[in-house]
Structure formats: structure tokens, C-alpha cells
Amino acid sequence: MANLKEIKRKISSVKNTQKTTNAMKLVSSAKLKRTEELAKRSRVYAAKLTELIEEIAQKMQHASAEGLDNIFFQENNNPKKVDIIFITADKGLCGGFNSQTIKRTSQMIAEYQSKGAKVRLRAIGRKGIDYFKFNNVELDDAIVGLSAAPDYKQSSEFISEVVTSYVNGDTDRIVLVHNGYVNMITQEIREDQILPVDASQLELSTVSTSEMEVEPDDDDTLLDALVKRYVEYSIYYALIDSLAAEHSARMQAMDAATKNAKEMVKDLNVKYNKARQEAITTELIEIISGMESMK
């Protein structure tokens, strides 16, 4: 009987876990839908901003004999000072979502250091912060809460310090790493060079001439302002993209956990019925044996 009670207790415990994981799956699914909508709206704004940068950059490129000469576009093929910004979640229970970002960030650190570059790490998200602190890796910046609730103002304040560092020559390159959303079942690691802006990614030779009239002396000022806004929006969009990926990863993890719990309950029920049958058989044998001994 003690064995039956133990199995019954396990069944009850697993069923409670199943209810919890299923509830977490439903919550993540609802949050994912909201984050997807936010990501769609953000992509439209980012595309328009990129178009403006392309148009102004093209105008400056054609106007100058030296081509596009702007601090935000000056590529350094052998950077000696690199800032890596990486985004992880504040919470776990989302499969390999955090570990994949941490793994790629660690690889990038090793790659840059092998080329003689000094790397500064800027972390967003508790899981990444905890990992590197545990491994005694110095973090130049660490923010908790922003990856769970992306905020444009806060993310802009965070990145403005890094941009200032770039303008002052304290860093040669700024790279952003995060786990991005592809669809409800797929996430992928994304690496974006934030600064300097990769001119090869801009369609400078194919964009149409802008109808916007800008004084030549204002071109550089306007481009600087647009690039800064572009950088601010890049980090904000990455936070949204990462959050969507986190929700989809957690939804998958909780779905798998719910299915596993269901299988465990099924196996435990079989085990319980078998043990109960054995207990009944034992009792019958004892009764029959007792009756036989009384004859």
C-alpha cells in the first residue's frame, strides 16, 4: 500500500506540473502575438529610416570627389577596440535560447582577441550577466529588465554612451548579438555591426533621387542625426526581436514539457494499476491461504 500511495503522490505532482507548463505555454503564446505586432510596426519605421540614410549618403557620395566621408561610415578592417553588446533574457525555461547567445558571444570575444583587439562587453539581460560574472569576465555595462520590457527611451540612453565612445575614438567597432525571431518554431543568432555603418549594405547606387531639398552644408549634420536615430532604433528593434524569440522558445519548451508530463502520467498510471493488481492478488492469496489453514 505504501508503494501505491507513493505512485499516486507522483501522479498528482506530475499533473500539477503539467498544468503549470501548459499555462506558461499559453501565456507565452499570447505574449508572442503582441510582440510580433510590435515587431512588424517597428520594421516599417526602420525601413523608412534606412531609405533616408541611403538617400542622404548617396547625395554626399556623388557631391564629393573623395566619396562618402563621414565618421559613421569609416570602416576599420582591423579594429583594435571592439564593443560587443549582447542580449539575453532575464528568465530561463526557454530551451537553448540564452545559451546559444552566450555561446556565440564567447566565440566572438575569442575571435577578436585572437586578432589583438581589446573587447568590451555590454550585457542586456540577467542570464548573460550572471553567466559572465560567474566566469569572472568583466562587463563594461550590465542592464536587467530591458530585455523583458523593451523601452525606447531607456535603450536610447544605453546606446548613446556607446555611440559617444565611438565618436571619441574609444572604440573602433560596435557589434550587436542577439537570438532573433524567425517564426513560432525557429530562432536564429543574429550579429549586426552597428557602427561603423556598413556602406556595402546600403543600396547607394540604386536608390532614387530624393525629393527632399537639403542644403549642402547641412548634409553631414542631417546624416549624423539620422545615423544616431538608426543606431537607437537598431538596439530597440533587436530588443523586440529578442523578446519575440524568447516567447517562442519558451512556448516550445513548455509545450515539450507538457507533452513529457503527459507521457509520465500515462506511465505512472500503468505502474499504479500494475502495483494495485499485484496488491490485490497478494491479498487474495493470503485470504485463500488463511482459509486453507483453517480446514
From Swiss-Prot:
User: What is the membrane topology listed in the Swiss-Prot or TrEMBL record?
Assistant: Peripheral membrane protein
Q: Which GO terms describe its cellular component?
A: plasma membrane; proton-transporting ATP synthase complex
Entry's InterPro entries? ATP_synth_F1_ATPase_gsu (IPR035968), ATP_synth_F1_gsu (IPR000131)
- Would you kindly state one Gene Ontology biological process term found in this protein's UniProt entry? proton motive force-driven plasma membrane ATP synthesis
**Pfam families recorded for this chain?**
ATP-synt
How this chain assembles, per its entry, is: F-type ATPases have 2 components, CF(1) - the catalytic core - and CF(0) - the membrane proton channel. CF(1) has five subunits: alpha(3), beta(3), gamma(1), delta(1), epsilon(1). CF(0) has three main subunits: a, b and c.
| Role noted for this protein | Produces ATP from ADP in the presence of a proton gradient across the membrane. The gamma chain is believed to be important in regulating ATPase activity and the flow of protons through the CF(0) complex.
Q: What is the official name of this protein in its record?
A: ATP synthase gamma chain
According to its UniProt entry, this protein's organism is Sulfurovum sp. (strain NBC37-1)
